[in-house]
């Protein structure tokens, strides 16, 4: 779950900086979503994808056909 399986974006390290300018280490984690992706061969696979790739339309999301009662 640590990386986007489309673009490879992963956690980046940085610093928290307080008002008194003290610095502590922290992680900037990507916003990953577990989505069902429709692949080119017609199969469906669950993948961890960052929201940047989702909003850019880099993947085609699979939507199951719901049965109406």
UniProtKB/Swiss-Prot annotation:
InterPro entries: Bacterial_rp_bL28, Ribosomal_bL28, Ribosomal_bL28/bL31-like_sf, Ribosomal_bL28_bact-type, Ribosomal_bL28_sf. It holds the Pfam family Ribosomal_L28. This is Large ribosomal subunit protein bL28. NCBIfam families: L28 (TIGR00009). It comes from Thermosipho africanus (strain TCF52B). GO terms for biological process: translation. Keywords: Ribonucleoprotein, Ribosomal protein. Belongs to the bacterial ribosomal protein bL28 family.
């Amino acid at each position: 779950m640590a990386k986007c399986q489309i673009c490879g974006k992963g956690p980046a390290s940085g610093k928290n900086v307080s008002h008194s300018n003290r610095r502590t280490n922290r992680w900037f984690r990507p916003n990953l979503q577990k989505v069902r992706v429709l692949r080119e061969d017609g199969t469906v696979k669950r993948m961890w994808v960052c929201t940047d790739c989702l909003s850019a339309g880099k993947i085609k999301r699979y939507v199951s056909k719901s049965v109406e009662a």
